Curated annotation (Swiss-Prot):
Source organism phylogeny: Bacteria, Pseudomonadati, Pseudomonadota, Gammaproteobacteria, Enterobacterales
Protein name stated in the entry: Pesticin receptor
GO biological process, one term: siderophore transmembrane transport
Upregulating conditions: By iron starvation. Iron regulation mediated through the Fur protein.
Signal peptide stretch: 1-22
Length: 673
């Protein structure tokens, strides 16, 4: 198997300062968890909500190796990219990120840290679990949480030695190699871990101009190191984590709208291959202090990202390098213990993001357009969340968040030799709230109702546009009404909900492709029902089934798209999987069969570009060859179903990106301990 040398990256990680991580390996269930949910497990916000939690083994069984594969295990979630992995299109409960690639409707968190929007699609390293919260989460999580939030929780080092290597190969000359080592450096005081990952997912698209036949894929190299200072018998601990990810991609690869089974790009003669290189550095410093009644958490995180991007667009060649910097600080305090009548969470939050973009659109004989832009965005917020346990079966909860948002832009450039430029500043204040009530009908059956708000802040277009002034768009706001239920026993888990979400001042792209600008496009309503169930019908065997039906439309008073469907929102979706364990004299066999159905949806607000219903079937078979060795074979998209993942109008004709089709592979994992 081809391997990539990551030794310099590992050495650099081991030389980082010996500061520790804020997360303990064993936590009281009622404590506030830094790297997962912000609320305690007893709070109304944690119980009066639709949620799904997936463990690391479940992720592995489903072949989820990157965040864009999470829809396989998180019902109702849809993730694709619009052009390339920098610009994710996420929809959940009828709320879509099609409105703004840089301000998603669902924010991705890793160990409590919000990721840059251009880092939403990323490879998964040493994941412990993933949690999806559906519906607006604005009071606890702030901006860009209208549809919900995704929490990715990674494994924290503790006194238990862990280590493994993984390797695998799959279709289109793709491969994956991974190394992890974790455990005590000085038991009772200091713990550490290191993870190295090389993940190659090549494509099979052909550029007839260059002869390249492996376009449309990605190649990622990732390193992560964690240190945790947690003295025994002390009420405090500290931690530090650092990672670096570099991904090369040949996306921005399109075919003709009706040529979804074709491999040749729809591209002008002489056009070069599309190319993108993204590198992201992340650092997190965190701490925790526990008293008899309270637990305090502090987190400070930084992300630096730069990428270069070149792609053909009609007769133009586009070069678009960009730099991002983000820092986040949060201080939280939560009550501790199971016998309290009132549980509380209080927090202070700051997020600052800075971006620089250089862009050049060149014709074969002369420059067409060039520009340089700078944008900033800062959020200062204070929030609280309270739960009143009226009885041992009935609770009510409420939360509020005060947020102050500031943004600025400055840009200049020239178009066919004509200069342009402008600058501007804006600020805005938001007050968000949520109320909920829950009642336990039995020890296993809960019903709840919830009203919650979410928003995306005001701001400016990231990409400068010639001839347009620096005019800010206003904040987009949503309110959600929900009624749900959850039933859970040792053998059966069932949850269902019905919801209505109203969004006003929607932020939506409009204008010519590649020169689109954000503006407020009116209002939209989303209504839907969702169901999720798991039946453990025999020892080692389970059956999962889920489904949803959603109607998400612009209202009649929307200026541009009145009565149209909101783009990137499937009208319905469903999924089912069967997982099992068969004991044999040669080791356990673990079969899995899963089907996923995605309903029709549009890629544009005009509702001209429609992808119809499609279904995919995935299968896998694992073999526990020895106590420490596991081998699995899999076939994703067994029947090679082709479908569009994104599309747009290119002049008078439409082009589309399509999925990769059937993938066959084999993986091996060997544990050290």
């Amino acid at each position: 198997m081809k391997m990539t040398r990551l030794y310099p990256l590992a050495l650099g990680g081991l030389l980082l300062p010996a500061i520790a991580n804020a997360q303990t390996s064993q936590q009281d269930e009622s404590t506030l968890v830094v790297t997962a949910s912000k609320q305690s497990s007893r709070s109304a916000s944690a119980n009066n909500v639709s949620s799904t939690v997936v463990s690391a083994p479940e992720l592995s069984d489903a072949g989820v190796t990157a965040s864009d594969k999470l829809p396989r295990v998180l019902p109702g979630l849809n993730i694709e990219n619009s052009g390339n992995m920098l610009f994710s299109t996420i929809s959940l409960r009828g709320v879509s990120s099609a409105q703004d690639f840089y301000n998603p409707a669902v924010t991705l968190y890793v160990d409590g840290v919000p990721q840059l929007s251009t880092n939403t699609i990323q490879a998964l390293t040493d994941v412990q679990s993933v949690e999806l919260l559906r519906g607006p989460q604005g009071t606890l999580y702030g901006k860009s949480a209208q549809g919900g939030i995704i929490n990715i929780v990674t494994q924290q080092p503790d006194s238990t030695p862990r280590g493994y290597i993984e390797g695998g190969v799959s279709s289109r000359d793709s491969y994956r190699s991974k190394f992890n080592l974790s455990g005590p450096i000085q038991d009772g005081l200091l713990y550490g871990s290191v993870t190295l990952l090389r993940q190659v997912d090549d494509g099979d698209m052909i550029n007839p101009a260059t002869g390249s036949d492996d376009l449309g894929g990605t190649r990622a190299s990732i390193g992560n190191v964690k240190l945790r200072l947690a003295p025994d018998d002390q009420p405090w601990e500290m931690g530090f984590a650092a990672s670096r990810e570099c991904t090369r991609a040949t996306q921005d690869a399109y075919v003709g709208w009706n040529d979804i089974k074709g491999r040749k790009l729809s591209i002008s003669d002489g056009s070069p291959d599309p190319y993108m290189r993204r590198c992201t550095d992340s650092q997190t410093l965190s701490g925790k202090y526990t008293t008899d009644d309270w637990v305090f958490n502090l987190i400070s995180a930084w992300q630096q990202q730069h990428y270069s991007r070149t792609f053909p667009s009609g007769s133009l060649i586009v070069n678009m390098p960009q730099r991002w910097n983000q820092d986040v600080q949060e201080l939280r305090a939560a009550t501790l213990g199971d016998a309290r009548t009132v549980d509380m969470v209080f927090g202070l939050y700051r997020q600052n993001t800075r971006e620089k973009l250089n862009s050049a659109y060149d014709m074969p004989t002369m420059p067409y357009l060039s520009s340089t832009g700078y944008t900033t965005a800062e959020t200062l917020a204070a929030y609280s969340d309270l739960t009143w346990h009226l009885t041992d079966r009935f609770d009510i909860g409420g939360g509020v968040r005060f947020s102050h948002d500031k943004s600025s832009t400055q840009y200049h450039g020239s178009m066919l030799g004509n200069p342009f430029g402008d600058q501007g500043k804006s600020n805005d204040d938001q007050v968000l709230g949520q109320l909920s009530a829950g009642y336990m009908l039995t020890d296993d059956w809960r019903v709840y109702t919830r009203v919650a708000q979410g928003y995306k802040p005001s701001g400016y277009n990231i990409v400068p546009t010639a001839g347009l002034d620096a005019k800010p768009f206003v904040a987009e706001k949503s309110i959600n009404y929900e009624l749900g239920t959850r039933y859970e026993t040792a053998d059966v888990t069932l949850q269902a909900a019905t919801f209505y979400t109203h969004t006003k001042d929607m932020q939506l792209y409009s204008g010519p492709v590649r020169m689109q600008t954000l503006s407020n496009a009116g209002k939209a309503d989303a209504t839907g029902v969702e169901l999720e169930a798991k039946w453990r019908f025999a020892p080692g065997w389970s059956w999962d089934i889920n489904g949803n039906v959603i109607r998400s439309e612009f209202t009649n008073d929307s200026e541009l798209y009145h009565g149209n469907r909101v783009p990137f929102v499937p009208r319905y979706g469903a999924g089912s999987s069967v997982n099992g364990v068969i004991d044999t004299r040669y080791g356990a066999l673990m079969p899995r069969l899963a089907v996923n159905l995605v309903g029709p949806h549009y890629f544009d607000g005009d509702n001209q570009l429609r992808q119809g219903t499609y279904a995919t079937l995935d299968s896998s078979l694992g073999w526990q060859a020895t106590e420490r060795m596991n081998i699995s074979v899999y076939v994703d998209n067994l029947f090679d179903r082709r479908y569009r993942t994104y599309g747009y109008m290119n002049g008078s004709s439409a082009v589309a990106q399509v999925n990769m089709g059937r993938t066959v592979g084999i993986n091996t994992r060997i544990d050290f301990f």
